Amino acid sequence: MAKAKFERTKPHVNIGTIGHVDHGKTTLTAAITKVLAGKGQAEFKAFDQIDNAPEERERGITIATAHVEYETDKRHYAHVDCPGHADYVKNMITGAAQMDGAILVVSAADGPMPQTREHILLARQVGVPYIVVYLNKADMVDDEELLELVELEIRELLSSYDFPGDDIPIVKGSALKALEGEKSELGEDSIIKLMDAVDSYIPDPERAVDKPFLMPVEDVFSISGRGTVATGRVERGIVKVGEEVEIVGIKATAKTTVTGVEMFRKLLDEGRAGDNIGALLRGIKREEIERGQVLAKPGSITPHTKFKAEAYILNKEEGGRHTPFFNGYRPQFYFRTTDVTGIVDLPAGTEMVMPGDNVAVTVNLITPIAMDEGLRFAIREGGRTVGAGVVSSIIE
């Protein structure tokens, strides 16, 4: 059978399955591909193909992740599923699999469990904006009232982590029945219903090019008679020649005008998200701008030194530390293009952090960096990566 060509005309959305071990995340992932394959919108992936996900290295961190793709009438989806709990933690913190929304799988027979809670918390911390729930193994619960209680418990749990628990779609079903091809309300129908909920409840993500302009400065040089050029890859938005931008981070914020945009030695009218450009800046001296700062649309981002973050600390096998660290730990934090020293405050009751742990920390940087919530960073010691993190909230 010839491979169906995915039409790229549909909006693209990244999603993933999250939830407690053995609640049926991988079975559900396989069932989605099976049911949609029946409509010619996916290639069926068996449980074992997904479960034996190859390990990938993302910024030195080993993560096992399965990627499947499929489409509905409305959209094209890239879906991630991880075999182990640790893989989810690493994936969500590093942003290796950036999710526009998640399908939370909860076993109706067990209700919410510790990892259910932890994945919801992580989703909140790392900025997964939308959650849809699949209440799996519903065929194992005969008592309708019990099902309603579990549903209520899930809604309350989601609300306690600032998700709109009352509005979130919860679809009851049996991923196993669907995978076995049973055409019933809890079987294939539940998968169709789930995908309808995902289609309608998770909005189209905002494209990088539609966001406010930002370019991390990688290099700076001066062109005699023309001025100072900052080079880098445009992270988001568009910059047009003649527009005002701010230089943010490290030093006091400065304003300037982009008088030229170059790419591959050619002059352009604008630079867009994804482009590697050189931006010619009016009235800026070579020493007034440096690597680690960003060029940004005025007022769109501000410099900060103190923030809360969710971090994963590499284990020894990943080339991380061999020993724990304690309160007052002072590594470098690598944001976009530069290292900044920061002091780590551990949460009350946490005496130390072991390699392989994930932890919520408060960080005080010695130099301000342009940041907003959701910004990823590496934790380094002398140029060696020992951890990864994401800004969960800004303090000052």
Curated annotation (Swiss-Prot):
Reactions accelerated catalytically: GTP + H2O = GDP + phosphate + H(+)
InterPro entries from the UniProt entry: EF-Tu_GTP-bd, EF-Tu_GTPase, EFTu-like_2, EFTU_2, G_TR_CS, P-loop_NTPase, Small_GTP-bd, T_Tr_GTP-bd_dom
PROSITE patterns named among the record's database cross-references: G_TR_1, G_TR_2
Species name: Pelobacter propionicus (strain DSM 2379 / NBRC 103807 / OttBd1)
Major localization class: cytoplasm
Protein name: Elongation factor Tu
UniProt similarity note: Belongs to the TRAFAC class translation factor GTPase superfamily. Classic translation factor GTPase family. EF-Tu/EF-1A subfamily.
Signal peptide (from-to): none
NCBIfam families, per the entry: EF-Tu (TIGR00485), PRK00049.1 (NF000766), PRK12735.1 (NF009372), PRK12736.1 (NF009373), small_GTP (TIGR00231)
Record note on quaternary structure: Monomer.
Bilayer-spanning residue ranges: none
Annotated Gene Ontology cellular component terms: cytosol
Segments of this protein annotated with the region G1: 19-26
Localization in the cell: Cytoplasm
Organismal lineage: Bacteria, Pseudomonadati, Thermodesulfobacteriota, Desulfuromonadia, Desulfuromonadales
Region of interest (G2), residue spans: 60-64
Annotated region described as G4, given as residue ranges: 136-139
Annotated binding of GTP, by residue: 19-26, 81-85, 136-139
EC number from the UniProt entry: 3.6.5.3
Keywords attached to this entry: Cytoplasm, Elongation factor, GTP-binding, Hydrolase, Magnesium, Metal-binding, Nucleotide-binding, Protein biosynthesis
Enzyme class: hydrolase
Region (G5): 174-176
Protein role: GTP hydrolase that promotes the GTP-dependent binding of aminoacyl-tRNA to the A-site of ribosomes during protein biosynthesis.
An example Gene Ontology molecular-function term: translation elongation factor activity
